[in-house]
């Protein structure tokens, strides 16, 4: 389970944060991700270890994810995991918030080969 936790945290660090709308709600993470992407029990384990409740929503295509995010107000989700080619599209449209790496205490554990890919 710990290996998956590290992978989830790494994915979270590399995923995009949609805004700081939920920033005052430090006990809840609004997470929008691919269907069947997270193993059963992992989010419950995350909550048990951190005390942070995860509100988990899923999508089956980038198009569905994108359309939903375009209709929602900024900050509907804290964490979204689109495919690489959609990240660039969303970046160009101002839909991505920069990640403050200084707040990621385990950032140094991420594989440098996976960072700053075009």
Regions from the PLM with identified roles:
Residues 1-2, 32, 102, 116:
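Generic cytosolic/nucleocytoplasmic N-terminal low-complexity/intrinsically disordered segments
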Residues 9-17:
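Bacterial N-terminal signal peptides
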